[in-house]
Curated annotation (Swiss-Prot):
Tetramer of two alpha and two beta subunits. L-phenylalanine binds at residues 318, 357-359, 397, 422. It comes from Methanospirillum hungatei JF-1 (strain ATCC 27890 / DSM 864 / NBRC 100397 / JF-1). The keyword ATP-binding applies. This is Phenylalanine--tRNA ligase alpha subunit. It comes from the Archaea. Its main location: cytoplasm. Its cofactor is Mg(2+). PROSITE patterns: AA_TRNA_LIGASE_II. Binds 2 magnesium ions per tetramer. Its EC number is 6.1.1.20.
Length: 478
């Protein structure tokens, strides 16, 4: 029977102890415990040893659990805060009212009558209170409550033991010779023939090595970098700017009326302070009120400069595009921006209050709507979406407008962003006379499709296993 040097050494030591742990044997053999487990596994395959794996689960108090162990659970603190009875309104001022009241009632410590909370007696410590002192000794149902309330974390520890078998003892008794083995050969050993006198270590090429997890860029960041590289390769220049913008650039410069619902507090994050209006703001005012020097009639009414001075977290990256165009009104311009934007969205599987958006613009003398479709098809194609089609759309600051759709196997046609040519009301105040092609898309939506996710929140969770297992290459082409 062929044994490696380390298998032989382990087997001889097992004769002395019969049963051992990888940690103990690692000290004797001067090898890491993981290596000893590997040697034991090889002996086990040959019937010379047995490797047992025992998993132990332990509960550890969280920071919140430690605090409640010292100060008492919310229900105990709330119970101790009043005498015989108290109104629900009074108890609601207590910092633990929301959690504590429900648990007091569930444990039978109180009853509720006519809007008052009445104690039913002096309660003994609850099972959860007792379990905080020694979580591991608690019954299974109480452990579940501790975990559900976030008072403990569950940790698994694995312990291995290695035991010599009767076959192992027989082989050791028959005599084992320890011979130094060579696992690698030098060029000199091969050319001189010295390798013939060496004891070469045998390798089983059918065995899979243990996985190695090197550093890896987050899949979402990697896709953002891929988008950036594609646009740079297509000749675009990247724009950068602050997430804090004046309402003028975020709304007014894009010909969004000042009474538009998107500007309300429930849709936009407003910040304290005012922003100065830029040089040339009067032409934007005239455009809103009467259409300025164009054929447009504007929105009518009086444009309020104070509303335009409001400070907001940008709701889109188009605010950077129009600022860049205002500073560079002469063609050609070919630029893009990938950045985070903020909206007051209710959190659900497809909406978050902050997300990444990609914005692109092209301004030149002879560009037209067909050029826009060509740019979009080329970009999505390089992202790996080979089937692209376009549907008419509507967006406030582009005309004509279009919605690109890509075909996803199993989902059908999926809309990915919006595009169009900037309206005259957007470009004229800055002296721009050439067509401006513009498009934008939600980066996270593309990521969900590329990675097969159903919940947007998965992109931002600290799930190391998911990061490890997501393929590095996911179908894009350059």
């Amino acid at each position: 029977m062929q044994l490696t040097l380390n298998e032989k050494r382990l087997l001889l030591e097992l004769v002395k102890t019969e049963t051992t742990t990888p940690e103990e044997m690692g000290t004797i053999l001067d090898r890491p415990a993981d290596s000893v487990i590997q040697y034991g596994g090889l002996l086990s395959q040959k019937g010379l040893a047995q490797v047992d794996r025992a998993v132990t689960t332990t509960l550890t108090l969280t920071e919140e659990g430690t605090q409640y162990l010292k100060e008492g659970l919310p229900e105990r603190q709330l119970y101790d805060s009043f005498s015989e009875s108290a109104s629900i309104a009074d108890l609601n001022t207590h910092p633990h009212a929301k959690i504590g009241l429900g648990w007091m009632k569930r444990l039978g410590w109180v009853k509720i009558e006519a809007g008052n909370v009445i104690k039913t007696g002096d309660p003994a410590p609850s099972p959860i209170e007792l379990a905080l002192k020694n979580p591991d000794a608690a019954p299974a149902d109480i452990k579940k409550d501790l975990l559900k309330r976030g008072l403990v974390t569950e940790e698994e520890s694995v312990r291995y033991t290695i035991t010599i078998t009767d076959e192992g003892k027989k082989l050791a008794a028959a005599g084992i010779t320890l011979t130094q083995e060579t696992g690698t050969l030098t060029a000199d050993q091969i050319s001189s023939g010295a390798w013939k006198d060496l004891s070469l270590r045998r390798y089983d090429i059918t065995k899979h090595p243990r996985p190695v997890w090197p550093g890896k860029i987050h899949p979402y960041q990697r896709m953002i970098d891929e988008m950036r590289r594609i646009l740079l390769d297509m000749g675009f220049t990247e724009l950068h700017g602050s997430i804090i913008q004046g309402a003028f650039w975020n709304f007014d410069a894009l010909f969004q009326p000042q009474d538009h619902p998107a500007r309300e507090m429930q849709d936009t994050f407003h910040l304290a302070g005012k922003q100065e209006l830029p040089v040339g703001w009067e032409k934007v005012r005239d455009m809103h009120e009467s259409g300025g020097e164009t054929s447009s009639t504007g929105w009518g009414g009086k444009w309020d400069p104070e509303k335009a001075k409001a400070t907001v977290l940008r709701t889109h990256t188009t605010s950077l595009s129009i600022q860049h165009l205002a500073a560079h009104p002469e063609p050609p311009v070919k630029a893009f921006c990938i950045g985070r934007v903020y909206r007051r969205e209710a959190i659900d599987p497809t909406h978050l209050p902050e997300f990444e958006q990609l914005e692109g613009i092209v301004m030149d003398t002879h560009v037209n709507f067909r050029n826009l479709l060509g740019y979009l098809k080329e970009f999505y194609g390089r992202m790996g979406f080979e089937s692209v089609r376009f549907r008419p759309g509507y967006f406030p600051y582009t005309e004509p407008s279009v919605e690109p759709e890509v075909y996803i196997e199993g989902l059908g046609w999926v809309e990915l962003g919006g595009a169009g040519i900037f309206r005259e009301e957007v470009t004229a105040p800055w002296g721009i006379t050439c067509p401006v092609l513009a498009w934008g898309l939600g980066v996270s939506r593309v990521a969900m499709l590329r990675m097969g996710l159903t919940d947007l929140r998965e992109l931002y969770q600290s799930d190391i296993d998911w990061v490890r297992n997501v393929p590095v290459v996911q179908g894009g082409r350059c």
